[in-house]
Regions:
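Class I S-adenosyl-L-methionine-dependent methyltransferase catalytic core
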Residues: 1-206
Length: 206
């Protein structure tokens, strides 16, 4: 080490990053995590996240989750904090993926895995009916991802499973979500939050 050089622990290094998220429930409640300053990054607001997990339930014990455009990891880590059995965080950006791995290590989150790659491809790689919830929060500029992501999620989810989708106000993609039932909808500024459910066989339309 050079004279005057200070070596930061991973936790201290994360605290120097320009942005932070705060987990709001579960075993890591109130934990703050540093996030790299990446253009276009748009963490799900605390109020929206709190509403989402009120919809899903506070205890996700045994659930299997996939966060396809993880970004800050706020959605998937929140699920893990509330007891999800397994959470796969998928992120293409190298800096964000590295930060997610630091979060996983700092929290000793054994249920969390981080994959640097394409979220839609990761969904296609899941066994049919193997997931309980899929989080879809792609960049608003990437609206072309909604249709393939929803289609891939429909195959990966169990009947009765959930898809959470964040989109901007211009998204009018009801045909893209035709295989789901819209359970909840929330508007918060530019964010339109949708909670879809994959119908049970008895609920499917003829």
């Amino acid at each position: 080490m050079l004279p005057g050089q200070v070596l930061l622990t991973p936790a201290a290094l994360m605290s120097t990053l320009p942005h932070q998220i705060r987990l709001i429930g579960g075993q890591w409640k109130r934990t703050r995590l540093g996030v790299p300053g990446v253009p276009g990054l748009r963490p799900t607001p605390d109020r929206v996240r709190e509403t989402l997990f009120n919809w899903l339930g506070q205890d996700l014990a045994g659930w299997r989750a996939l966060d396809a455009f993880a970004g800050t990891g706020a959605l998937g880590l929140e699920a893990a904090s509330r007891g999800a059995q397994s959470v796969l965080l998928v992120e293409q950006d190298a800096r964000l993926a590295a930060a997610l791995r630091q979060h996983q290590q700092r929290l000793s989150a054994s249920a969390v895995q981080v994959l640097r790659g394409d979220g839609v491809a990761a969904l296609h790689g899941q066994l049919a009916g193997s997931l309980d919830v899929v989080f879809l929060d792609p960049p608003f500029a990437a609206a072309s991802l909604y249709a393939p992501a929803l289609a891939a999620a429909a195959k990966a989810l169990r009947p009765g499973g959930f898809v959470y989708l964040e989109a901007d106000a211009s998204w009018q993609g009801r045909p893209e979500a035709a295989s789901f039932t819209l359970r909840r909808h929330l508007k918060a500024g530019a964010v339109h939050a949708h909670l879809f459910c994959k119908p049970l066989p008895t609920e499917e339309k003829p």
